[in-house]
Amino acid sequence: ARKIGNEIFLFLKDKHHLPINREKSGIRRPVNFTILGFGFVPTYKKGEKGKYQLVVSEKGWKNLKQKIKTITRKTTPFTFDERIHKLKEVQQGWLQYYRIASIQEKLKDVDGWVRNRLRCCIWKQWKKPERRRKNLLRLGVDLEHSYSYSRSRMGTWAVACSPILRTTITVERLQKRGYESLLIYYQKVAPFLNEPLYTRTVRTVV
């Protein structure tokens, strides 16, 4: 492996005059290798030993979450529509770059986290207990629960993650305000999910 690696290095350097960074070049297992924000993991499919699929590196996920945190920080003076607009720009730009990676399951977790952050912003925006009570009533909560929920002593994040807001500020209601999940947009742009049917392997559905 080292001999082949050196031959490739010399070929690229001498024949094509390409600059090669020795520190970033090396011989290593795919699972220990990242490049341009991508990593590799085994496919774990029967009959596919030695095959790997492309995923997003930990640094790539960290960068995305940091940008989302900035936009959805409850103290940032954005209107809800402004947050949604900026959130779309960040999510779509990130997914356009990483669309070739296999990340569907991970996106589901991130989507849930993003929605809770949006609920947190909404709860913070309502501020006073009486305003919260009236808004909960508008969302279909009964009189008794709207009063007790609006005066909950739980923290903002705890309320956002609880049934108080998860059953009232639903995914459908967020979508009506312009929200689009990472998973839905990924399913639109991921090339291996949008190939013509005749190019895909036929699978038996049971």
Describe the predicted segments one by one.
Residues A1-V206:
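Non-catalytic terminal/accessory segments
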